[in-house]
Amino acid sequence: IKNCIETSPLFSILKKMPKGGILHLHTSSSGDANWLVKRAIADENCYIYTQDDGSVLQGKMAVFPKGTAPPGFRPMHELAAKDNHFITKVVEMITLTPEDSASPNPWDKFEACFERVGGLVYYAPIFIDYYRQSFEALAADNIQIVELRAGSGEFNGLYDINGNNYSSDEGI
């Protein structure tokens, strides 16, 4: 149905129209999930937790200097090279579906999505690219106003591969 809607003449007219705004947009979910996963795969320092042992959330993504990833974390670029469905599998772990919202505990999946991507979106190189991509997509859709929802200290969580942390002023 989604494809039918997106290819309809009415949808193309609506796409060109100016929009109001997006309110309460979470900073770590403002971008395209496919783009984020592909960007992570392009960075050899991005890892994903692959075990289902309860010690770390399966699918949690993080950035580590080469050779320092804790047990259970595997390089995303290596997994993607071996599995043609890797991107789809990861996107499903970080995206809410209608089935998730109908489940008895939809907040569990919602919170897990944020936990899975948090290690990526606050890694400075990805953060910069992620926001650029996010705002370019919003501008292309004629969104006029964006209200970002950032928790206290959220922009203080920015870091780089050398272990440097950045202040909220530097993050913004």
Regions found by a protein language model. Give the residues of each.
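Metal-cofactor-binding active-site regions of metalloenzymes
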Residues: 1-172
